Amino acid sequence: DISKDAQEGPTEFVWPPARDLPGYRLPGKPNQRRLAQAAEVISAAERPVLYLGGGLNRAQVPTEDLTELVELIGAPFVTTLTALDVMPSEHPLNLGMPGMHGTVAAVGALQRADVVVCLGARFDDRVTGRPDTFATKASVIHVDVDPAEISKIRTADVPIVGDLADVVPALSTEFRDHVAADGRADIAPWRGEVGRIQATYPTGWTDTDDGLLQPQEVITHLDRAASEDTIWVTGVGQHQMWSAHYLTFRRPHTWLTSAGAGTMGYGLPAAMGAKEACPDRPVWLIDGDGCFQMTNQEL
């Protein structure tokens, strides 16, 4: 224990001469053999799905690099709560968010997939539910900068440790070369199947009998009125899930939300920080009453 007077008293801090983090090393370039193995598995897949996570944002993977990989593979993709802005919401291969608050198409595609390519996500319980029932027919390719995340929840058939900014373009090159040499499986029937599910079960809401506005409708109108460079921020709760489904993202780094920790009260100070960092861009906070009351004194 540290005594209260020691906790509250002034002290002097001196930076150590070297910042040493024992037990952790930044990964080098991705393993070429693993990349080749991943390209082989993807090219043989008849029902592949790309599972895109927030690590793509944190690694600052260029949009053009990610778009090239997605369109080269041509598979439908899902985006986790922290990755909603890594690819345009209106991209024809985008199935939306997976998991317990996800779209029917995203959940259904993962459950039917024969290969899941996970880029910067962690197979958390809000996506998988019970891990032993998640995508049971799929081989898993898992890419992460942290080796401790790989095979932690779901065993990876092809583990790749590396910075996604390096892995994404390298995998594009490897996949293109493999297909040129050996061809690939036909995924047109799979894309058609997923497209039919998406068309049959769109995201929507039911109008109220008394004609009052639904929250989803309010968010939709706000989205239509906002400019493309708007930064969207939310608190945690139902309004967060409505925002995830009804906002349209067209560029990266336009979405701030508390996901894994799920911290109520996050929204207002985060929105103020976003505006301080980007004073020339509009910033909208969509918040709940409970979240707002937790930190409204920040104003």
Language-model segments: residues:
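Active-site diphosphate/adenylate-binding microenvironment
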Residues: G192-D280
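Conserved thiamine diphosphate
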Residues: D1-E8, L81-L84, L110, G120-H142, ...
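Glycine-rich phosphate/diphosphate-binding loops that line cofactor/substrate pockets in enzymes
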Residues: R34-L50, L69, L110-A113, H221-T230, ...
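Thiamine diphosphate
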Residues: V107, R112, I150-V161, A165-P169, ...
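Conformationally flexible catalytic loops at phosphate/diphosphate-handling active centers
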Residues: D1-A44, P202-W205
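Glycine-rich beta-alpha junction loops
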Residues: D1-Q7, G54-L56, P147, V236-Q240
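Glycine-rich, acidic loop regions that bind phosphate or pyrophosphate groups
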Residues: L26, A83-R191
